[in-house]
């Protein structure tokens, strides 16, 4: 029988899970929200520059706010988890990219490992729902490679927080175009050339971002993919890599007007920079 009480329902829960919780009563619960584009750790460089440099979207920060200690969090980051999600995850790699952005509900006695296991189970449902393993394979990518490219797309352009369906869909079409560029460059053994990867490398090292930072994560300096994802991709960026835009573009820029401009050749790309990217492109 259903017990009286207040239950907070997470979007990721199935009907059976909801009914089971209502039958057992809901109490001592906690709500934890993770974010698309979030990373496991806050930027060491930003944190060293000011007391307000902590990234409030980082997984560690969010888990701290939920009442867990740094030791509990660190141990959970190193723990082993049972999920088909990790079938092709390289041995020894971190959990970067797997803490799927969503709002989750937990009992008060849930451990950090319980929290992360629930998150991974939910992410695998997203993988299954969108048939990502097969769709990535059709692009010549493993699940881990697709996840890694999607994380770069996410940091280049996040779409999950767009306020209207129309704006979110327009943003998603840009994500598909960006995914097409990165996949094409990867297949041609070209450097991906993504600025967000050297920024991630600098954040991990605790140094000021520089385009020539010597790190395997810096795709402006090294060919191939970074060793791991650089953030948690949202569902839209995952779908963008699974179904990239048609075409053979090899370049893109974010213009000063907020639009994305694509090009097939270096000459076209330089023309786009001259026309549309005087401010933003001078920063790097």
Regions found by a protein language model. Name each.
Residues 1-2, 36-41, 78-79:
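Acidic helix-start/capping segments at beta-turn-to-alpha-helix junctions
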Residues 1-31:
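Terminal hydrophobic membrane-targeting helix
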Residues 11, 36, 108:
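Flexible glycine-/small-residue-rich
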Residues 14-15, 39-40, 111:
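Short, structural beta-strand-to-alpha-helix junction motif
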Residues 17-19, 42, 114:
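Short acidic, gly/pro-rich beta-turn/loop elements at beta-sheet edges
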Residues 30-50:
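Primarily a LysM-type cell-wall glycan-binding module
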Residues 45, 49-53, 57, 62-284:
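Bacterial extracytoplasmic/cell-wall-associated proteins, especially those involved in peptidoglycan
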């Amino acid at each position: 029988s259903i017990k009286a009480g207040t239950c907070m329902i997470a979007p990721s829960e199935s009907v059976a899970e909801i009914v089971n919780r209502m039958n057992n009563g809901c109490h001592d619960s906690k709500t934890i929200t993770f974010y698309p584009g979030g990373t496991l750790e806050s930027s060491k460089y930003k944190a060293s520059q000011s007391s307000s440099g902590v990234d409030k979207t980082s997984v560690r920060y969010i888990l701290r706010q939920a009442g867990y200690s740094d030791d509990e969090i660190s141990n959970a980051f190193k723990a082993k988890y049972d999920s088909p999600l990790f079938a092709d995850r390289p041995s020894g790699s971190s959990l970067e990219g797997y803490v799927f952005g969503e709002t989750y509900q937990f009992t008060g006695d849930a451990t950090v490992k319980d929290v992360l296991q629930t998150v991974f189970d939910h992410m695998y449902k997203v993988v299954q729902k969108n048939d990502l393993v097969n769709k990535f394979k059709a692009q010549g990518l493993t699940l881990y490679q697709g996840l890694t490219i999607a994380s770069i797309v996410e940091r280049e352009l996040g779409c999950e927080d767009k306020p209207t369906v129309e704006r979110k869909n327009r943003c998603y079409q840009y994500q598909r175009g960006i995914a097409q560029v990165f996949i094409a460059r990867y297949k041609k053994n070209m450097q991906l050339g993504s600025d967000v990867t050297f920024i991630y490398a600098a954040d991990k090292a605790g140094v000021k971002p520089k385009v020539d930072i010597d790190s395997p994560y810096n795709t402006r300096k090294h060919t191939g993919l970074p060793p791991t994802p650089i953030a948690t991709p949202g569902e839209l960026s995952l779908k963008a890599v699974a179904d990239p835009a048609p075409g053979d573009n090899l370049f893109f820029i974010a213009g000063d007007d907020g639009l994305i401009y694509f090009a097939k050749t270096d000459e076209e790309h330089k023309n786009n920079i001259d026309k549309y990217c005087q401010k933003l492109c001078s920063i790097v």
